[in-house]
Structures are given as C-alpha cells and as structure tokens.
A protein has these predicted regions:
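PLP-dependent amino-acid enzyme catalytic core
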Residues: 1-498
Length: 498
C-alpha cells in the first residue's frame, strides 16, 4: 500500500489519497494528513529544466500514490493548459531585491487557480476509482478568492455541483461580480449576512451534520470540499514552490543547495503550509515568513504561542486575509505534537469551545522555522506605492502585505537570504485599493469600478486581464442571500430536497 492519510483528530486512519480528496474533511472534523512527508526523489538540477507540468507530476506522484501515472498525468494536462496566460504557469519577477512568484495567471487571476484547476479532475478521477455513483456536492466558504476559482474549476464538470458561500460585505466588487456572473448549470453562490469565519464555521457544521449527510445520501448526493482543508488543494500548491526554486537555479540566481526564504500573505494557512511541506520534502528553505494584515491572529500566535480568536474582526484592503480561524494551522499543530491526534484534537476543542489554545514550549520549538509579521492597511498601501514608484512593478494588496512584512523582517533581522514572495492575486482583482494606494483618493473620484480598472491600466501600463474584461458586461446570474443560521436550508433548497 502506498502513502495513506489519517485525521489530525485520530478518528480515521489508512485512508487512500483518492478517498481523502473525495471526503474533503475527515468524519471526526479533523483534516487529513499524510502518514509521512515524502522526500523529493528527483535532483533539483534535473527539476531545473522541467516544465511546470513535469514538475507537478514529480511532486504530486509522491502524495497521490493510488493514482496511476496515466491518471495523474491526465489530470495535470487538463489543469495546466491554455487557461493560463503564460506557458510558465507561475513565472517569477525580480523587483527590489526579491523574487515575486506570480500565482495569478490562471482563469480567475488569483493563486487559488493553481490548485482549483486540477482539483475537479482529481476528484472525478477519485470518484471513478472508488466506484462512487452519487453526485458530489462541493460546499465551499470563501473570503473572495477561492469561490470564483472553485466555481470556474467545477463549472459543468459532470457528476458535480458546487455551492459557494461568501460574506456579503467582505469581498471586493470585482470578486463579487466574478462569482455572481459565473456560468455553469451546476454552480450556485450565496451571500451570507456575516463574515468569512461565519461562512467557514457554517460549512464545517454541515460537514459534521450526520442527519444532513444521511438525507443527502438518500437523495443521491455526497458532500466534499474545495477549501484548502481538502488535501487535494494542498498538494498541488507544493508544486509551485519547488518549481520556483528550480527556475531560480536554472536562471543562475541561486546555487544548488542554497537556502531561500519564502514570504506568504496568510489567511487560512494553506499556502504557507504548502511551502513548509516543500521544505520538509528537502527543498532548501530557511525561513517561512507568515505575513498577516490587521487581523493578526497568526502573528500573535507565532510571537506568543497563544492562538486567540476572541478579538475584533477588522475589514481591510486585503479582504482574503480577513480571517480569525486559520483552519490549516491544525495540520502544523498536529505535526508539532509528534502526530499525536489526542493532543491536537484537545487543542482544537479548546479553540471551538473557549476560542483559544496555547501550545507547549516543545511545540513552539518545532515551529521555529516560521516567523510572523503583520502590516497595517496604511503600511500596505505605502509599500505598494513605493514599489511601483521605484520599480514600475505593480502588486495587489495581499502581496503588498507580504512585501511590507518582508521589508520589516529584513530590516530587523539583517537576514539577506534570497527571498521568494508569493504574489497571490492580480492587482486588477483589487483595483480600487491598488489605485488608491498609488494615486490617492483623487484617483478614485467620480469613477465606477471599471473606470478605475481602466485608469489603473493607463497609469501603470499593465494590461487589463481577460478575466476582468469578461465580467465588464456579463449578466448577473446569482442573487441568493441568507443569514448565517439559514445556510443549511439554503443548501437543501438549491439541491431540491427542502
């Protein structure tokens, strides 16, 4: 038997990769973790000459061991194709002494495309492999980015439905339009009267609702998740960190075995966890800088060892990071306990029941590769403007948080290790905030969202992405809204089982 998966809370063991992807969340509410982190078995200098698709196979085959070579290569080929506007898929851009890993060249101009382009193919392949004949209902909470990418990935995929919940006042105008204009007879999106944590908690409750599960199965449905709690989201994200290192090696920017640092703007902790998995696989990564916005629960955690979600929720200009419950941190907690499911489960119950937990000194020592930092909205805007004024390179507000935190980290630590910054969205996904950062409030006056887009393009010389042009005149197809307590009824209504 190849690599298997178990729950971080101990309720499920020896689950195959395909079943873990199909389930999304373990039955006990935990997240699936591989029984071990496999080591890269291709030399880095050989990876340096590989395409993104070839690199993806070499990384993913180590985690998805019950997929055949043909199955996995077929999923990869269907995912990383002309949907991306560059053959490199994830190019690197050097600016102001750092390497920006541009993860926004997919169909929805955000990093979630990197995993959500392949997840539908991994999932439908898994259903065939496991003889599942029920319709798979993808249930997803989004802070703005995952929703559109998931809907685009699953649109009209046979045997699937997708239902996305997002906070009504917690996403950008472009993000909302991208979701509400999404085509596909199997797609639904619902605005909730609450924040992202409310949406995520509501989705998790539905996953754990045994009565709802039985009712769905009786009607021929089965839940799964497209959120980064699904291991099928996490594994594809490891690929681009390996690819980035290999391309730096190929370009002569680093030497074989030379350490790099990685800076990631962080909300739900999935993207930076993928970088950590790459490090555990043998990629020469020294420090992982976890960049937070004003919702700095992760900064406080890495600084004090205490995770406390009982605090004010702040709406910022980097809305996809406006999160107080970072779900994927549970996987790192599990690893830091020595994979003790009882210990990690106890801490997660503390978070659920009391809103906080504290890790031991030994667990903190295990996490010493991580450094936390945060940037205020003002620091974020100033960083975007300075980088643009100095170099002409334009970044979005989430990448701005990362760049700001990196600047402070480098100043305070004196660490001049070559650094990759995860650039997680096109500046046009957050054109209002980016324009305000580089041109001030007067740059926005009298302009609607698309006039701001055009002004930003004229000012920066950066072309407007096709994904934004497509929604300029697209018809709104989705108008559902509900309260936080009505999410289950909304799902049942959409599926016709109410």
């Amino acid at each position: 038997m190849g690599l298997t998966y178990q729950s971080t809370r101990g309720g499920e063991k020896e689950v195959t990769a395909s079943m873990a992807i199909l389930q999304g969340l373990a039955k006990d509410g935990g997240l699936f973790m591989p029984s071990c982190i496999p080591q890269l078995d291709v030399p880095l200098e050989k990876l340096a000459s590989m395409t993104y698709q070839e690199t993806a196979y070499e990384v993913m085959k180590l985690f998805l061991t019950d997929y055949t070579e043909k199955e996995l290569k077929d999923c990869i080929a269907r995912a990383y194709d002309s949907k991306f506007d560059t053959e490199e898929i994830a190019p690197l851009a050097k600016a102001d002494g750092a390497y920006y890993l541009e993860l926004y060249h997919g169909s929805t101009i955000a990093f979630k495309d990197m995993a959500l382009s392949i997840l539908p193919h991994l999932m439908t392949t898994a259903a065939r492999k496991n003889h599942v004949d029920r319709e798979i209902v993808i249930l997803t909470a989004t802070s703005g980015v995952t929703g559109k990418a998931a809907m685009a990935g699953f649109a009209d995929v046979p045997g699937t439905r997708i239902i996305v919940f997002y906070p009504k006042d917690g996403v950008s105008k472009v993000q909302e339009l991208q979701m509400r204009t999404q085509k596909g007879d199997n797609t639904s999106v619902v605005a909730i009267h609450g924040n992202f944590d409310d949406a995520q908690t509501g989705v998790k409750k539905m996953f754990g609702d045994k009565d709802l599960e039985a009712e769905l199965m009786g009607k021929g449905f089965q839940f799964s998740s497209a959120n980064s709690i699904n291991i099928g989201r996490l594994v594809p994200q490891i690929v681009y960190y390996v690819y980035a290192y290999a391309k730096l090696l190929e370009a002569g920017e680093i030497e074989k075995g030379e350490n790099i640092n990685v800076v990631v703007p962080t909300g739900n902790f999935g993207n930076i966890l993928a970088a950590y998995f790459a490090k555990c696989m043998g990629l020469p990564v020294k420090t992982l800088v976890c960049a937070s916005n004003d919702n700095k629960v992760l900064y406080d955690f890495f600084t004090t060892g205490i995770y406390d979600r009982k605090r004010e929720f702040i709406l910022t200009n980097s809305p996809s990071m406006d999160i107080l419950i970072s779900s994927n941190l549970e996987r790192l907690i599990y690893m830091s306990t020595g994979c003790d499911a009882l210990a990690s489960g106890h801490l997660m119950r503390g978070l659920s029941q009391e809103g906080r937990y504290e890790v031991t000194p030994e667990m903190r020592a295990f996490m010493s590769d991580f450094v936390g930092g945060f940037a205020t909205q003002e620091q974020n805007a100033a960083t975007i403007k300075k980088l643009f004024d100095d170099t002409g390179y334009l970044i979005d507000t989430h990448t701005g948080v990362a760049a700001s935190v990196y600047g402070n980290y480098r100043k305070e630590s004196g660490d001049d290790t070559k650094t990759v910054i995860a650039s997680t969205a096109s500046p046009y996904k957050f054109s209002h905030s980016v324009m305000e950062a580089i041109a001030g409030r007067e740059g926005l006056e009298g302009k609607d969202e698309f006039e701001i887009v055009d002004a930003l393009s004229a000012l920066s010389g950066v072309a407007v992405p096709q994904a934004v042009e497509e929604i300029r005149h697209a018809a709104v197809r989705h108008n559902r809204e509900c309260g936080v307590d009505d999410m289950k009824n909304e799902v049942k209504d959409i599926l016709g089982i109410s």
